Regions:
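N-terminal Rossmann-like FAD-binding beta1-loop-alpha1 element of flavoenzymes
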Residues: 3-24, 153-159
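Dinucleotide-binding/catalytic capping subdomain of oxidoreductase cores
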Residues: 26-30, 157-296, 377, 381-385
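N-terminal Rossmann-like dinucleotide/flavin-binding domain of flavoprotein oxidoreductases
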Residues: 35-92, 243-258, 262
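Core beta-strand elements of the Rossmann-like FAD/NAD(P) dinucleotide-binding domain
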Residues: 87-92, 139, 298-307
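Glycine-/small-residue-rich beta->alpha transition segments that form the dinucleotide
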Residues: 92, 96-103, 149-150, 306-319
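Glycine-rich dinucleotide-binding loop and its adjacent helix/turn
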Residues: 102-181, 330-340
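FAD-site-proximal beta/loop scaffold in flavoenzymes
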Residues: 114-132, 272, 278, 290-357
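C-terminal, flexible cofactor-proximal segment of oxidoreductases
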Residues: 338-342, 346-446
Length: 446
């Protein structure tokens, strides 16, 4: 049985792993639009999170399995291999394409110069080859990060990091140099609800307090608006730990430092204000708990100076060519991973990961999610294998115009990144664009 897995991030790799573990004869091709595997583990995990990035080694083991083949540089859909053609070449196709875009605030001024999504910022400092944005910190003294999840914590931390801490990472040189020259000394991370409802995890939160020459401040008055802050005993343990960390910062005495991170709560963004043709401040309405788990506006407003605004209010799935799509949830309709068309599950087409369930959970959540989808696929296998597939799909993919980057090509990229880092007196440094990546694949020094 031949199966195509579209996407080589955690959900794609765990799907491939589950397939070869549960079926003795399955052959899995893991296809990716990029020439590099690992998805958000490579292009979403903060460069200073080496322990999480080391998950690449686990995913690497999957992609090096004798019955798994990595094929990068293959676009599925418009401009690439049609989804219908892919379906003809394999007994089954599993889409693990994640949530490719970010949510917007929907407020005036959101499109001003100096206002960006956290996704754009992360892509820049992670050397995603599609990233064309730069100049994030140029001219900025104060930054506002809207959102209180782990991505918001990541970008806040990156803005407060110094060159000494960033140099040992694989961050590309242009981003490293820009952040080293940054004049940002104030970072405000803002949530519209209270601390007990924040999405960040305690480990990531505590990291903010360990940054050199940086102070974290929290308003005790804002924290006290949250009923669960006053009495955290009913809270689940993770939220309770967060509250205790915040309580400690709120009680701390001010100290002389070069940078400050201010954690703000119960502030709803209503407008980004212009100053000299770019963002100059963010305007918020104060909120209070509404007694039903949400918040309501108070009619009181506050402006926070900011020459840089990063929104981090969630990811969103995008339609996949040839598949049904639920615009409300940003997912492909499915039952246990089987794609649903016209109210009925369709054997042969499957989804796993964020495009299946929405952008929730941590990296490890994708393992049981993938296993559920693979269980559905293998239940359908007796019907699926009746299709006669004698030829290797690789030839047909090339005939369709694809130029696959096989595992040897990815290994060439890894070698080039190690050589680049050595030439700069650093460790491994990511190649920053498509041309550099493809030059490495083809052995070109140009």
């Amino acid at each position: 049985m031949r199966v195509a897995v579209v996407g080589s991030g955690p959900s794609g790799c765990y799907t491939a792993q589950s397939l070869v573990q549960q079926h003795p004869d399955v052959l899995v091709d893991v296809l990716d639009r990029l020439p590099c595997p690992y998805g958000l583990v490579r292009y979403g995990v903060a460069p200073d999170h080496e322990k999480i990035k080391s998950l690449q080694n686990n995913l690497r083991t999957v992609l090096e399995h004798e019955r798994v083949r990595f094929l990068g540089g293959i676009e599925i859909g418009p401009g690439g291999v049609p989804a219908a053609r892919l379906r003809e070449l394999y007994h089954a196709v599993v889409y693990c394409v994640g949530a490719a875009t970010d949510r917007h605030l929907g407020i005036p001024g959101e499109d001003l110069p100096g206002s960006w999504s956290a996704t754009e910022f992360v892509s820049w400092y992670s050397a995603h080859p599609d990233s064309t944005a730069d100049g994030f910190v140029i001219g900025a003294r104060s930054a506002v990060v809207i959102g209180v999840g782990n991505v918001a914590v990541d970008v806040t931390r990156m803005l407060a990091r110094g060159v000494t801490e960033l140099s040992p990472t694989d961050m590309p040189d242009p981003a490293l140099n820009a952040l080293a020259a940054s004049r940002v000394t104030e970072v405000h991370m803002v949530g519209r609800r209270g601390p007990s409802q924040a999405r960040f995890t305690t480990k990531e939160l505590r990291e903010l307090g360990s940054l050199p020459d940086t102070e974290v401040t929290v308003s005790a008055a804002e924290l006290a608006l949250d009923p669960a802050y006053l009495d955290p005993s009913p809270l689940p343990a993770p939220q309770g730990r967060n509250v205790e960390v915040l309580r400690g910062w709120a009680a701390a005495e001010p100290r002389p430092v070069s940078r400050r991170i201010s954690l703000r709560f119960f502030l709803r963004p209503v407008e980004l204000l212009v100053d000299g043709g770019r963002v100059g401040a963010a305007r918020f309405e104060r909120t209070v708990p509404d007694g039903r788990g949400g918040v309501r506006g108070t009619g009181e407003f506050e402006e926070i100076e900011a020459q840089l605004v990063l929104r981090s209010v969630g990811y969103r799935g995008m339609p996949v060519e040839g598949l049904p799509f639920d615009a409300g949830s940003g997912t492909v309709p499915n039952v246990d991973g089987r794609v649903v068309r016209g109210g009925s599950a369709v054997p042969g087409e499957y989804v796993a990961g964020w495009i299946k369930r929405g952008p929730t959970g941590v990296i490890g959540t994708n393992r049981p999610d993938a296993k559920e989808t693979v269980t559905s696929l293998l239940e359908d296998a007796p019907t699926l294998v009746q299709k006669d597939l004698r030829d290797d799909p690789l030839d047909a993919l090339r005939a369709a115009g694809a130029e696959p980057v096989e595992w040897a090509g990815w290994c060439a990229i890894e070698r080039a990144e190690a050589e680049l880092g050595a030439s700069l007196g650093r460790g491994v440094v990511k190649l920053p664009d498509w041309q550099a990546l493809m030059n490495a694949v083809h052995g070109s020094a140009s």
